[in-house]
Curated annotation (Swiss-Prot):
Binding site for Fe cation: H112, H116, D353
Record lineage: Bacteria, Pseudomonadati, Pseudomonadota, Alphaproteobacteria, Rickettsiales
Keyword presence, Cytoplasm: yes
Statement: the UniProt record of this protein carries the keyword Iron: yes
Cofactor requirements of the protein: Fe(2+)
Protein location: Cytoplasm
Protein name as catalogued: tRNA N6-adenosine threonylcarbamoyltransferase
Residues binding substrate: L134, A135, S136, G137, G138, D167, G180, N325
PANTHER family documented for this protein: TRNA N6-ADENOSINE THREONYLCARBAMOYLTRANSFERASE, TRNA N6-ADENOSINE THREONYLCARBAMOYLTRANSFERASE, MITOCHONDRIAL
Any one of the GO CC terms: cytoplasm
Stored Gene3D superfamilies: 3.30.420.40
Gene for this chain: tsaD
Cofactor note (record): Binds 1 Fe(2+) ion per subunit.
Main localization (coarse): cytoplasm
Length: 387
């Protein structure tokens, strides 16, 4: 039985996991660093890298013990090799390559974002293709997931990432780190319509997003208030979260339209299995403001008849740390259901950074014999389109 060991160290969680070829998670160890970074209100890269260096040996021992596995039983070692905080990425990647060399087992460099993108294939066995909203501390983008290593970014944030925005607003409100769960908790107690915040570029007609103006609006409101008590904090958190939900819902509709248009274009003009030329696609070839409304039922019947039915997937996936937010899951699920799609998110413990997703991405690459050289250079920036 094949067993893949995955290592994740791109931010502030040291994680190692072992999964089997049948997608069973034998062990999924995470050593968090929240206490080390809480005093700073955010992740300090140097502290994170040093903590990874201290934690990896213990994490490996724990994962082997819990899974009742010997190192010699491991078939391949997969490790996050970008994007992320480069110090931590280097530490984890070097650790993995050392194991690979010592055990004479294949090394597989994994793009952290691909790990998030494929998590639902580990948990729900979703087939390709599907539309993905990747929302995390460092990224926010809509992605057409057309196959392993075949990704097209339909739109992304042009400034701050969504998770980063949650953390910064939480810090403004003197909430603890990490800020996302604290905002969600406080929002349940507040009035989402108390304060009206801007929704930057919401009417731009594309899938791009902007959160810096929203963050600034929250800061300006806080500075203008004479008193910021618990009730005010709850209302600000609720209004902020409501605004985020409205932005994502609006952009989701644009993404659905563009995604289906891409499928229709490529699967009628390109041999999907051998020659999917994503590099040739330019978003400006498709004017969203003049597209047929393919989200309507009659149009979806047309789509089902216009290209191979096995390629029509009614699943939309939300992944990344922000996907753990139950409010946003509900809002986006209601939005997608209106247009005939179902929204799926990984279990909460697999939304945030973990090594099981890295091990699974490694399994898919292992099965396709997509191995990496031991001199693979870790990357601080690494787009899904450049894998």
């Amino acid at each position: 039985m094949k067993k893949i060991l995955g290592i994740e160290s791109s931010c502030d969680d040291t994680a190692i996991s072992i999964i089997t070829e049948s997608r069973k998670i034998l062990s999924n160890i995470i050593i968090p660093q929240n206490t080390e970074h809480a005093v700073f209100g955010g992740v300090v890269p140097e502290i994170a890298a040093r903590s990874h260096l201290s934690n990896l040996d213990q994490a490996l021992e724990n994962v082997l013990t819990k899974s009742n596995t010997e190192l010699t039983e491991i078939s391949a070692i997969a490790a996050t090799s970008g994007p992320g905080l480069i110090g931590g990425v280097i530490v984890g990647s070097m650790f993995a390559r050392s194991l690979s060399s010592a055990l004479n087992k294949p090394f597989i460099a994994i793009n952290h974002l691909e790990g998030h993108a494929l998590t639902v294939r580990l948990t729900d066995n979703i087939s390709y293709p599907y539309l993905l909203l990747l929302a995390s501390g460092g990224h926010c983008q809509f992605v057409a997931v057309l196959g392993l290593g075949k990704y097209k970014i339909l739109g992304s944030t042009i400034d701050d990432a969504i998770g980063e925005t949650f953390d910064k607003v939480a810090k403004m409100l003197n909430l603890s780190f990490p800020g996302g769960p604290e905002i969600e908790k406080r929002a349940k107690l507040g009035n989402p319509h108390k304060y009206k915040f801007p929704k930057p570029i919401i009417n731009s007609g594309n899938c791009n997003m902007s959160f810096s103006g929203l963050k600034t609006a929250v800061r300006n409101l806080i500075m203008s208030l004479k008193e910021v008590n618990d009730s005010v904090i709850n209302d600000i958190a609720a209004s902020f979260q409501f605004t985020i939900g409205a932005i994502l819902s609006s952009k989701m509709l644009n993404a659905i339209r563009l995604y289906q248009q891409i499928l229709n274009y490529y699967y009628e003009n390109v041999d999907y299995t051998t020659n999917l030329n994503l590099k040739s696609f330019r978003q400006d070839e498709f004017n969203l403001n003049h597209l047929q409304d393919i989200t309507r039922p009659k149009s979806r019947i047309y789509l089902q008849n216009s290209f191979r039915s096995n390629l029509l997937n009614d699943t939309i996936v939300i992944a990344g740390g922000v996907a753990a937010n139950k409010y946003l899951q509900e809002i986006l699920s209601n939005c997608t259901q209106t247009y005939g799609y179902r929204l799926i998110a990984p279990p909460m413990h697999l939304c945030t950074d973990n090594a099981a997703m890295i091990a699974y991405a490694g399994l898919e690459r292992y099965n396709n014999k997509l191995f990496s050289p031991l001199n693979f250079c870790p990357k601080a920036k690494w787009s899904l389109e450049d894998i």
